[in-house]
Amino acid sequence: MDPSSLSNPQECKVTSLNLVLSVNFEKSQLQGYVEVASQIVKEGTESLILDTNQLEISHCNDVTSNPINFKLSEEHKVFGKALIISIPEGLRSVGKEFIVRVYYNTTVDSNALQWLTKDQTAGKLHPYLFSQCQAIHARSLVPCQDSPSNKVKYQAEITVPKPLTALMSALSTGKTESTDSSVFTFTQEIPIPTYLIAIVVGDLESRVIGPRSKVWSEPSMVAAAEYEFANTEKFIAVGEDLLTPYVWGRYDILLLPPSFPYGGMENPLLTFVTPTLLAGDRSLEGVVAHEIAHSWCGNLVTNKYWSEFFLNEGFTVFVERKILGRLYGEEMFDFEAMNGLKHLHDDVDLFTHKHQEELTALIPNLNGIDPDDAFSSVPYEKGFNLLCYLQSLVGVADFEAWLKSYISKFSYQSIVATQMKDYFIEYFTEKGKSEQISVVNWNDWFNKPGMPIEQVVFVSPAAKVAKDLAEITWIKDQGVNATKDDIKSFKTQQIILFLDTLIHSTSEKPLSVDVLEKMDSLYGFTDVVNSEYKFRWQTLCLHSGLKRIEPKVVEFLISQGRMKFVRPLYRELNKVNPELAKSTFNKYKSQYHIIASKMVAKDLGL
Ligand SMILES: [Zn+2]
């Protein structure tokens, strides 16, 4: 049983959804019905139970329009309401198919959906809609069995006002037009967990960026996006080489409006990304490697429950770093691993400080907990470290062969960690390596809170160069020997590490304003486009009290709404100029995604 869902796939399993919806921008609603096909898996099951959250259900019919009885449960504040639909008596035996149409509409409180007004878009001419269903928000878009343990196919028929375009995490199968609206149809033939259902509606244009890829965005950003993501096919090709053939057909990228609160979301066939990746020089294209790695880890082999999230994210980070290593030099794997370990350290400290240490176990107990509240780098980085440790026991070549085999064995399934463990043991016992792997303390790896129990040592000379520049040239020697050429040959990750090291190592004793001015005159950080540099540089300046950075910070805060940047920057600005932080937020809060504006308000004590 999935503790994050109220539904009953273990009794009556949903196999496909057919969404027939129209998009109403005036009311900020999706309206229509979903046809749910299900199959009885437990003899005598009387009801099909679906998850819903903040939906208005009007009625249920069978396919011949006869009414079907249903009721809604009491509301659970995190998991929503169960929609309990009576299965007709003749259809309650194992193997029988039950099809029901649920007529409903979403509401303004459906938190999977963000409705943007014209003014909140880049073009300012048309409204815009996008969804974010992970982890448990699909139930506020469509009544469904909203558990990653159950995979479904889906079709959709979406009516939108002209001249807007609809896209989904599915193959596009056509478009028909009437006087003032267009109908877009889609099909997703590969069963997916419901958190991967995605929709976007807006003034969208596309450019071809590869043999199976297009990039989509509002017209004003499409040329920049085309340039930035031109290397996408290389990442997919390395992924295929490492793992198995790419099965989804297309791999498109959707560049969202600036208020998209996340970095990226691996919706199948259509990765969603933030426009803060537009650096103008492809220096942030590596983020796409992560989303591409999800095409196998997560989207094909899926965590059965959210407590096993490391099966999605730990594996994805591992594959992402393998891809980056192959494309940018093997050292990049260790370099990124070292950075990741630092983030893991920070999060373990943070959760321990909040007395939530149990959430730092690789498989935490999420009973009654919103998976979003447990979110941290733990499943990503601790999961990654487990795989590095296992790799160190059996050797790189054999581990990569196992990984390929693991993906092909568990593709199209939802699994738990013990299945992964059992397959690892089975595979390497057969290969005569049972002694090497007998040392693994699986129980502690999976269940013990805190840092990884075994630590693989990562080595990166490039990281040392970046750290030395921060610690010796700038912190110790105050920049007296610094020159313009210091960072000329640095890779993106080195500049990020350089700035991170400065931030961390000067948190007690900030650099002086004079030192920062010198750094800026040599490296030109104030005017960079790269959002990762800008975010760190502004943090550093606020911390040192460099007043002239404040208007630049405001400019950055109101130009995008990615939580990774806006939350910490508002907090820093609030420390040095609370009036400016609060007035800026109050003036622009409607521009942010609802989740982001709630979080920032909390951070600012509003
Ligand atoms: Zn991910």
Curated annotation (Swiss-Prot):
InterPro entries: Aminopeptidase_N-like_N, Aminopeptidase_N-like_N_sf, ARM-type_fold, LTA4H_cat, M1_LTA-4_hydro/amino_C_sf, M1_LTA4H, Peptidase_M1, Peptidase_M1_C
Catalysed reaction equations from the record: an epoxide + H2O = an ethanediol
SUPFAM superfamilies from the UniProt entry: ARM repeat, Leukotriene A4 hydrolase N-terminal domain, Metalloproteases ('zincins'), catalytic domain
Active site, renumbered: E291, Y380
Magnesium as UniProt keyword: no
Keyword set, alphabetical order: Cytoplasm, Hydrolase, Leukotriene biosynthesis, Metal-binding, Metalloprotease, Protease, Zinc
Positions with a binding annotation for Zn(2+): H290, H294, E313
Gene Ontology molecular-function annotations: aminopeptidase activity; epoxide hydrolase activity; metallopeptidase activity; zinc ion binding
Main localization (coarse): cytoplasm
Family: Belongs to the peptidase M1 family.
Name of this chain's protein: Leucine aminopeptidase
Species for this entry: Dictyostelium discoideum (Social amoeba)
Gene that encodes the chain: lkhA
